[in-house]
């Protein structure tokens, strides 16, 4: 893998990118071969020899930590909710990891997004965690604050930043203009900031573009109850609104106004330039706080299976930039994605298996909108810049 060529194509000058370049000297001749492990093999592998794995990172290795935290609110011992009606919220702002929630650019912003998914606090010296792909840096599995797992923000965001300047700003400008978003439709939520109940249901829908249906033609969303967002047929069970959501949390809860919902799978639309890439999340936890009629201070945390994430990048990158029309350059990019694996697809991190997923943490803000009632037409992707 020619990391130097990849960095040259991206123009990435970050410390992370330079660190990955150093790793190419540690024996990565074909990371794509090892990325066959992306598909999720749980076959045992030999534990790593010890903390001094990569000399390039050991000199600045994080000090070992035993502090645990960064967890979502636990399920309360509380009665089932008796609140009636549905409440629907659209994500209006998404924080990807290169800025704080206040919009301040920071190389460490990613550390405050996500949750401690594997129950461990990991740094470059940790050995009780899943095995890195050969060639990945020792700190590829380093956690954020309080053990928050977010390799996406730590290791992939520099690549995205090289493809799209100010990706969070681009994402949120797109949402304001009506680019695809995510809806959460909640049953059992009273909107009381002190509510504590179990037995809530949360349906999640990926939408099409706001203006893709006739009633919204020429309009931008207002992020009020006047907005009717069309949802993708794939976001429903059987291709109709009446069939219900394909992604449902049936045992959600709320603690002191903080909503917690878990999903087995949840694709999250993310804007890359003019192309929308669906983040193929699994083992997902979504939290948000009830405030002023909206769900605020939201967090989406989960894992991206490495093979699925490579496929998502493959489908999107040629529609974003001509930098990877060269098949070798594209392969370098996909290998770099694979090398970011820091966790298991099931959300655990066991020393006897190889990492086969990429942890992710995002922040969001939402606003109340109309209940789901309309399907979006099939989306039309932007042109492939490498064939047009």
Where are these regions (language model features)?
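Residue-level detector of functional hotspots within protein domains
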Residues: 8, 35-37, 57, 245, ...
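Bacterial Sec-dependent N-terminal signal peptides
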Residues: 1-9
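Ser/Thr-rich, Pro/Gly/Ala-heavy low-complexity intrinsically disordered linkers and tails
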Residues: 1, 18-79
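Bacterial N-terminal signal peptides
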Residues: 8-21
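Extracytosolic secretory-pathway proteins
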Residues: 61-388
